[in-house]
Structures are given as C-alpha cells and as structure tokens.
Amino acid sequence: MLDYFWLWSEMIVRWVHVIAGVAWIGSSFYFIALDLSLKPGKELPKEANGQAWQVHGGGFYNMVKYLVAPKKMPEELTWFKWEAYSTWISGMALMSLVYYGSASLYMIDLEVLDITQLQAVFLSLGGIVTVSYTHLRAHETSSY
C-alpha cells in the first residue's frame, strides 16, 4: 500500500511541476511579446519606456512599462513570481521524492563509492548549495 502512495505522490508532484513550468514559460513568453510590442507615446509620463495596447476576451488593455518605479505606486500590484516559485518548490519536492527517497537506487553506485543513503543526499544538497552560492557570487561581482 505504501508503494502505491509513493507512486501516486511522485506522479502528482511531477504533474504539478510540469504545469507550473508551463505557466512560468507562458508568462515569460507573454512578457517577451509585451516588451517587443512597446511603442513610445507622446502622452506617456517621462519615466515610462513605452506602451502597448492589447485586446483579450473583449476587453482592451493599455500596458505602460516603467524602467524605474513610478512616483505614485498603486495600492494593489500584481506580481508574476509564483510561476517561478511553484516550479522551484515542486522541482525540489520531486527531486526529494524521486532521488532522495530512493537514493540507493538512483544516487549510489557501490562500485564507485560505498556511502549510505543519507551521505548521498547530503553530498547532493552540498553540491547544489555550492554551485548556487558560486553562481550568485559570480553575478555579484560582474557588471551588467
């Protein structure tokens, strides 16, 4: 019975990860298309970089892009961050279920290195943290 629970958990988390990834890619494509369609306008504030008029579902939208925050921020602001967050969180959950849950099957080759499952998991997490830290430090020192 526990095997079925494990398999269903993997399948559900895998689909959540796929759907979150598709949402993230979709919103990224939307903003690429939005940036490419921006046009300058005479009636725009000086802080604005451009505007794009769009139509969807019978409604018209006037999108204005600011390169810096406008002087007066709206009370409610829509953040497009949860697509990326949910992809990352579901990916970590999937990695934990598939690889860390079955570390002896996927992560350990006794002919190469005789380690326990816990050691394999900590080596993996240590590698992820090291690569992430190195990547962040490289971007802090580089100039864009």
Regions found by a protein language model. Name each.
Residues V112-Q119:
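Interfacial loop-to-helix junctions that mark the boundaries of transmembrane helices
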Residues S96-D109:
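Membrane-helix interface motif
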Residues S28-K71:
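Membrane-interface amphipathic/juxtamembrane segments adjacent to transmembrane helices
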Residues W24, S28-F31, D35-K39, I89, ...:
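Transmembrane-helix bundle segments that line or gate the permeation/cavity pathway
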Residues V68-S90:
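Loop-to-transmembrane boundary segments
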Residues M1-W24:
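Long, highly hydrophobic alpha-helical transmembrane signal-anchor segments
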Residues Q119-L125:
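Structural signature of hydrophobic alpha-helical transmembrane segments
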Residues T134-T141:
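Conserved small/polar residues in nucleotide/adenosyl-binding loops
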